[in-house]
Amino acid sequence: MSQPELLLFDTMARELRPFNSIRANKVGLYACGPTVYDYAHAGNLRTYLFVDVLRRTLEINGYEVNHVMNITDVGHLVSDADTGEDKMEKGARKQNKSAWEIAQFFEQAFFDDLKLLNISTPSVTCRATEHIQEQIKFIQELETKGFTYQTSDGVYFNTDRLADYGKLARLDKQGLEAGIRVEMAEKKHPTDFALWKFSGDKPRQMEWQGPWGIGFPGWHIECSAMAEKYLGDVFDIHVGGEDHIPVHHTNEIAQCQAKNGHVQANYWLHGYFLQLKKEKISKSGTSLRLDALVAKGYEPMAYRYLTLTSHYRSHLSFTWEGLSGAQKALHRLRNKVAFLPSNGNVDESYRELFMRHINRDLNMPQALALVWDVLNSELLPENKRATALFFDRILGLDIHKIETVEIPEHISRLVELRTQVKRQGNFKKADAIRNQIHDLGYQVNDSGDGSTVTIRS
């Protein structure tokens, strides 16, 4: 059967576009990573789940993916308008630790979360603090080409030099100029942004000697410099959250156009927010951190399941009822798959339908629904399992695994009693014991290897 064409929604073009890689069977993918001054929350993690699904989809289509992700451990100011203090310095003061300790701690916490959510590790992880010279060199080239100017607090990019600045976000640059109501200090235009910020009179924990003075790089320059180092000055796909469109990605594009004469990525993909009561979730609260969900009795993979029920370009409203429903559905799915026989074959008609769903801009709600269709179909049991596990290469739910739980002693005794009466041929009594176990909140699963017990969903 023919492979359906892979279509991706390109934010720059505002349309679905057939995906064609620069090099045959290889993809360069750059993902904006976390600013490691605090724990990631569920909204942050939704973006990385979307990136994981994208990577898995590319791989199942036969591509070798070079997935590069940055770690912002310096330079991201509290305000995207280049004002306020560095988030790392602020986090260090809050935790009474050094900025370096904060970065190391929260970077590890972030990767722990990725592991719990079964998110693939990037091919390359690059920290901003380990690429200062690359960023300085990038700024110097912009300076040589006349795209920068210096103020008393730093070196800025002159957005007026680019005729199509803001194309990605459809920014009304003239409207911004006319409607500006905030203090611009020495900036020439409201859209100009910092490339290098001076430390000033107060020494910082993170600062470097640059050609313009002691300071630190701006937030946007790190991604342009590191993407070019690891993927070249033009690569296939750049991804991030929808909040990156109007400022961060717009400014990345400006830097690369100014330096190289072209946009750095052929496709721009953006995941939409997770919302709580129709508002964007921020890092200010702790209730939607992954460890908080676990403390409430939810397993991390239930959150992964929940995100698959909504398209990545749709806002997902978070509710505890929704997460509970996702956990129950995940348990039912595992129980259905775990006790199906092995050594089956993937059904080709279902495979083609699944590929059609995922290849049309990662339509995971339809792909997830198809798993249930397969399990409720008339396929041979072993082929149901093989087909569902093929789907799980994209879903990433590890549906062949059943969580190990401690079974209470009185339940274990009932299971043992049921096994004995079955051996004696008293199947009516065995069924009665099964029902008793069911009423107590557990499920007996019989197979050729004996019986196992799981918590009833």
From Swiss-Prot:
GO terms for molecular function: ATP binding; cysteine-tRNA ligase activity; zinc ion binding. GO terms for cellular component: cytosol. The keyword Zinc applies. Zn(2+) binds at residues 32, 223, 248, 252. Its cofactor is Zn(2+). InterPro entries: Cys-tRNA-ligase (IPR015803), Cys-tRNA/MSH_ligase (IPR024909), Rossmann-like_a/b/a_fold (IPR014729), tRNA-synt_1_cat_dom (IPR032678), tRNAsynth_Ia_anticodon-bd (IPR009080). It catalyses: tRNA(Cys) + L-cysteine + ATP = L-cysteinyl-tRNA(Cys) + AMP + diphosphate. Its EC number is 6.1.1.16. Keywords: Aminoacyl-tRNA synthetase, ATP-binding, Cytoplasm, Ligase, Metal-binding, Nucleotide-binding, Protein biosynthesis, Zinc. The keyword Cell membrane does not apply. It is found in: Cytoplasm. NCBIfam families: cysS. Belongs to the class-I aminoacyl-tRNA synthetase family. Monomer. This is Putative cysteine--tRNA ligase 2. It comes from Photobacterium profundum (strain SS9).
